[in-house]
Regions:
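Protein kinase glycine-rich loop
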Residues: 23-31, 35
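Activation segment/activation loop of eukaryotic-type protein kinase catalytic domains
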Residues: 155-188
Length: 284
C-alpha cells in the first residue's frame, strides 16, 4: 500500500468518486476519517462515504471495521435492528472508503441545535423511551453476536427521522468480540465504565453503562460524568452510584493508580489517560 504525503482527500462539488458517486458536501471530520455526502448515480440515492485518512494505523483499523460491518449486515436487517446499513467499500486514490446509507444529525449535534434555538421540548420522556428502545434493540442484536460496541456515545447515534424519533447506532471502529484480547483504551471518557477505567476485564455491560450516561445527558442537558480528570470522574461515579465493587479493587490492574490501600481516592491524578481523543469536555 502506498501513502501520499497528503493525509486528506478533498473533492469539488459534483466531482465523481470512483466514477459513480457524485460529491455533494462534507458532513463532518473525525480523528481518522472524513464523512461526505454523495449521490449514487447508479442506484439513484444519496449516500454517506466515510473517507479514511491516509495513515497505515487508520487503514488497518478500518479494515477490521469493514469486516465487522459485513458480519453484522449479513446477520440482521439494519432497519429492524437499528444499525448502520453499509452498501459498499473500495480503495480510491490511496484512500479506503466505506459507503453507507445517509442519516441525519447525531444526538449530540441535534441536541445542541435544539438548545441553541431554545427548543428543548423535543426530548420528552416518551421520545427518549422510543429512542432508548431502538438503541437497546441494536445492542441486544450485536451482543447476541458476541460483539461489544465499545464506543457508544451521543456522536455515534444518528437520527434517521426527526419526526418519527427513529435512530441508528454507527461507528463500529472500536468494537470487538467478547473473546478477543481486550484493549485498555476504549470508550470516550465521559461514557467509560468503571471496570474499563480500573483495568478490569470487561464485557457487554460496558455498553449498557455508556447508554445510561447518554440517557441522563439528553434528559438533563448535562454530561453525567464530566471528563476534566479521571480522578474527579471516579469521585462523581462513587457519589452517584455508590462504592466501587470489591471485585474491581481486586481485579483492576490500574486500581493502584487511583486508590490508596485503604480504598481512598488520591487527591491529585496519579495516572495519565493516553487516549487523547477522549479528553474533550462537552457543554450544551
Amino acid at each position: 500500500i502506498g501513502y501520499e504525503p497528503e493525509k486528506e482527500l478533498k473533492f469539488k462539488k459534483d466531482e465523481l468518486i470512483a466514477g459513480r458517486y457524485q460529491y455533494e458536501k462534507e458532513l463532518g471530520d473525525a480523528a481518522f476519517s472524513t464523512a461526505v455526502q454523495c449521490f449514487d448515480i447508479k442506484e439513484k440515492r444519496y449516500v454517506c462515504i466515510k473517507i479514511i485518512k491516509n495513515n497505515k494505523d487508520y487503514f488497518d483499523q478500518s479494515i477490521d471495521e469493514i469486516k465487522l460491518l459485513r458480519y453484522i449486515n449479513a446477520n440482521g436487517d439494519p432497519d429492524k435492528k437499528c444499525f448502520l446499513r453499509v452498501y459498499d467499500y473500495f480503495y480510491y486514490k490511496e484512500h479506503l472508503m466505506i459507503v453507507s446509507e445517509l442519516l441525519k444529525d447525531n444526538l449530540y449535534d441535534f441536541y445542541k441545535y435544539l438548545t441553541d434555538n431554545n427548543n428543548t421540548e423535543y426530548f420528552s420522556v416518551e421520545r427518549i423511551q422510543k429512542l432508548t428502545k431502538q438503541i437497546l434493540i441494536c445492542l441486544e442484536f450485536i451482543h447476541d453476536l458476541k460483539i461489544i460496541h465499545c464506543d457508544l456515545k451521543p456522536e455515534n447515534i444518528l437520527m434517521k427521522s426527526i419526526t418519527d424519533a427513529t435512530c441508528k447506532v454507527i461507528d463500529f471502529g472500536s468494537s470487538c468480540f467478547v473473546h478477543d484480547h481486550l484493549s485498555a483504551y476504549i470508550q470516550s471518557r465521559s461514557y467509560r465504565a468503571p471496570e474499563v477505567i480500573l483495568g478490569c476485564r470487561y464485557d457487554y455491560k460496558i455498553d449498557m453503562w455508556s447508554l445510561g450516561c447518554i440517557l441522563a445527558e439528553i434528559y438533563t442537558g448535562n454530561v453525567l460524568f464530566q471528563n476534566d480528570s479521571i480522578q474527579s470522574m471516579l469521585a462523581r461515579i462513587i457519589g452517584i452510584c455508590g462504592p466501587i465493587p470489591n471485585w474491581m479493587y481486586e481485579k483492576g490492574k490500574l486500581v493502584n493508580d487511583f486508590f490508596t490501600k485503604e480504598k481512598l481516592l488520591y487527591m491529585e491524578p496519579n495516572a495519565v489517560d493516553n487516549n487523547e481523543s477522549m479528553n474533550q469536555t462537552k457543554k450544551y
